[in-house]
Regions:
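A polyanion-binding, active-site-adjacent surface
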Residues: 2-259
Length: 259
């Protein structure tokens, strides 16, 4: 079945085009859209992503876990995040950025930390990177209203630097509780900061892609590039489509397992 007109528009918004045979009425739904070639030659659709299941990731217990965060309901959790002073990042923030979306969503997307726009508006992924994430979601048949989006860090680091380990450790119980309350069926890790935090590794992001990991031996996780990186390296967008296909595969298997 060929992609719908809506999905083709979304792929174009990502800066991608999909090659299809002119004389064919059907197309492989697993085909990976590619960046347009400089010579205008069509690109053959890639094979479906190979599923490689990685061992479950043991999640570390931080000192902040003992303050009762692990028992909070959504309203109390969001209130505690908004008033958090656990690390120095609160001193320069306009506001904390807990997360946004459906609090019963199957899909959870985890980024790194708020930027200037997010700090001002109190919502993750609202700048140019957020616009690209919206296009990526639409290309996958999703919307911001259907997923839950959060960051590993809830306050903006100065000059948009990467979060420090101490800051991440203080914020991590909040993220753990968000996952526990949400109970997602699939988690997509956006960028190396989120991947390193959730997988407890320092491997290059390219080596972490193409595998299905397990959060607490339950929830499948897939690694992909951060939208901000894609704005600087648009040639990597097609790989994000591959990662989304892998996430869809993991979600289907998870749903079948729970049926």
């Amino acid at each position: 079945m060929s992609l719908s007109e809506r999905k083709q528009i979304c792929l174009q918004a990502m800066g991608l085009t999909l090659w299809q045979k002119k004389d064919a009425n059907t197309a492989d739904p697993g085909a990976v859209p590619q960046e347009p070639g400089s010579a205008g030659d069509p690109v053959e659709p890639a094979a479906r992503p190979r599923v490689v299941v990685s061992p479950a990731i043991e999640q570390p217990v931080t000192a902040a876990s003992a303050d009762g965060t692990a028992t909070l309901a959504w309203p109390e959790l969001l209130q505690r995040i908004a008033g958090c002073t656990r690390c120095p990042l609160h001193q320069n923030r306009i506001q904390a950025v807990p997360g946004v979306g459906d609090q019963a969503a199957e899909w959870m997307f985890i980024g790194e930390a708020p930027g200037k726009d997010e700090d001002e508006q109190g919502e993750p992924f609202v700048g140019r990177a957020g616009q690209l994430l919206n296009a990526i979601l639409h290309a996958a048949g999703l919307s911001r209203e259907q997923v839950y989006i959060a960051n590993t860090i809830k306050c903006r680091p100065p000059a948009n630097r990467n979060p420090q380990h101490e800051e991440s450790d203080q914020c991590y119980p909040f993220l753990q509780r968000q996952i526990a309350l949400l109970q997602p069926k699939i988690i997509v890790l956006l960028g190396k900061v989120a991947a390193h935090r959730m997988l407890d590794t320092d491997q290059a992001l390219g080596k972490l892609r193409g595998k299905i990991y397990r959060y607490q031996d339950r929830v499948p996780m897939v690694v992909t590039y951060h939208p901000a990186y894609l704005l600087r390296s648009p040639s990597q967008k097609a790989k994000v489509w591959e990662d989304l296909l892998l996430a869809k595969t993991a979600l289907a298997e998870q749903s079948a397992r729970q049926a």
